[in-house]
From Swiss-Prot:
Entry similarity comment: Belongs to the peptidase M20A family. DapE subfamily.
GO biological process: one example: lysine biosynthetic process via diaminopimelate
UniProt enzyme class: hydrolase
Name this protein carries in UniProt: Succinyl-diaminopimelate desuccinylase
Note on cofactor: Binds 2 Zn(2+) or Co(2+) ions per subunit.
Reaction catalysis annotation: N-succinyl-(2S,6S)-2,6-diaminopimelate + H2O = (2S,6S)-2,6-diaminopimelate + succinate
SUPFAM superfamilies, per database record: Bacterial exopeptidase dimerisation domain, Zn-dependent exopeptidases
Record bears the keyword Cytoplasm: no
Coiled-coil boundaries: none
EC code: 3.5.1.18
Keyword Cytoplasm: no
Source organism of this protein record: Shigella flexneri
Amino acid sequence: MSCPVIELTQQLIRRPSLSPDDAGCQALLIERLQAIGFTVERMDFADTQNFWAWRGQGETLAFAGHTDVVPPGDADRWINPPFEPTIRDGMLFGRGAADMKGSLAAMVVAAERFVAQHPNHTGRLAFLITSDEEASAHNGTVKVVEALMARNERLDYCLVGEPSSIEVVGDVVKNGRRGSLTCNLTIHGVQGHVAYPHLADNPVHRAAPFLNELVAIEWDQGNEFFPATSMQIANIQAGTGSNNVIPGELFVQFNFRFSTELTDEMIKAQVLALLEKHQLRYTVDWWLSGQPFLTARGKLVDAVVNAVEHYNEIKPQLLTTGGTSDGRFIARMGAQVVELGPVNATIHKINECVNAADLQLLARMYQRIMEQLVA
């Protein structure tokens, strides 16, 4: 199958860019963008490669994405080696095919076609690309955004190429994401012998009523755009492994995926009040990995919906479900942020794949979005 989008996707898949190693992917993208008149600024931080590229001036539409991929797992379980792209029955297989090298290829080819047709486009077209979205993400998009904000860069619209679709490309568009807040909680007791409980203080017993009440809380009921806030206990650890020792500490880690009905400070206050109510001795550490954000109907959402309806003849659902994405950092710039990408059914799995025709369709959609906003 000869197609510039498929060919570029295959070239990217052949580069085993395990986070945060870019493995030469960005050099390939930069070469293509510079050839059509983009100015490229590399913005590397520690072991992470990033670049910010732009062409033109005025209202800015940025395309954002990541070159890194998650590990392939057991390569012997793949129908072909994970970094050797293969097309079977119209499906392109390879690690990163859906998440998100196919989107990157579609973005770049769309930009090439757009610039060829609109060499003097009125707005500014930009790219924000990182090699660390899948791992810690500490030195990726967040650092680039901080640098851009420090010099008052303008970003009006941002299209993130994360695989948003469920069954066919464009059936779901993400116009927001929930916030994510993790609590690392240690309940302190006194270690002792199980035969002498009066000489010890069992933190597991002490914490049980607190945890019971915590999991029963209805944090909110969500709203028009967000499902209800969810709290899940992810890890819990106590004890020495011996059956005759009362543990001295209990560690509990729980995560909130929260809507715009709450703030992280409101959640923290409620958890701390509950700890005090149960008279627990504790230490607590919080990690806020992202605030919730929402892009209401406006120029970007309308342009994306128009592009999907034009090429796939379906009306996309606007959803805020799923995990976090780098869109949470870009939203800080005041930009309208929307995610549109391929079907996500196989992301992070053995035999990750994407419908090759979907990538061609995605490139056309991306180009139509450019034409509506910065032509």
